[in-house]
């Protein structure tokens, strides 16, 4: 699902909201999550999951094509850990919000 598909689905399920307002809300949520991660904060959406940042140390790597060793710089990468309700839903269980 793309961001525009998500916006369209939310607007469909909430006919009292204008699609442009839903777009602003979704964009604001994504921006806030990205800003929090950029600050090094953790974002927890209980039941859904938690976004955090993992720091990876610099290391020696190997070019798989040539076998040559190369320096791999330290980096920061986003990380997502699923919440219990989402894991249960994906594994065939029922989630509490299935009563739509």
Swiss-Prot record:
Its keywords, alphabetically, are: DNA recombination, DNA-binding, Transcription, Transcription regulation, Translation regulation
Check the record and name the InterPro entries matching this protein: Hist_DNA-bd, Histone-like_DNA-bd_CS, IHF-like_DNA-bd_dom_sf, IHF_beta
Gene name?
Answer: ihfB
Cross-referenced PROSITE patterns: HISTONE_LIKE (PS00045)
Q: What is this protein called?
A: Integration host factor subunit beta
The similarity annotation says:
Belongs to the bacterial histone-like protein family.
GO annotation, cellular component aspect = chromosome; cytosol
Gene Ontology biological process terms, A to Z: DNA recombination; regulation of DNA-templated transcription; regulation of translation
SUPFAM superfamilies on file: IHF-like DNA-binding proteins
Pfam families in the cross-refs: Bac_DNA_binding
- GO MF terms held by the record: DNA binding; structural constituent of chromatin
The function of this protein is: This protein is one of the two subunits of integration host factor, a specific DNA-binding protein that functions in genetic recombination as well as in transcriptional and translational control.
Q: How does it assemble?
A: Heterodimer of an alpha and a beta chain.
């Amino acid at each position: 699902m793309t961001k525009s598909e998500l916006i369209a689905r939310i607007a469909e399920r909430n006919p009292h909201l204008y699609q442009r307002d839903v777009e602003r809300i979704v964009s604001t949520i994504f921006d806030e999550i990205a800003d929090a991660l950029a600050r090094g904060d953790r974002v927890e959406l209980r039941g859904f999951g938690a976004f955090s940042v993992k720091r990876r140390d610099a290391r020696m790597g190997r070019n798989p094509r040539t076998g040559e060793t190369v320096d791999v710089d330290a980096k920061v990468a986003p990380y997502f850990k699923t919440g219990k309700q989402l894991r249960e839903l994906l594994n065939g269980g029922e989630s509490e919000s299935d009563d739509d």
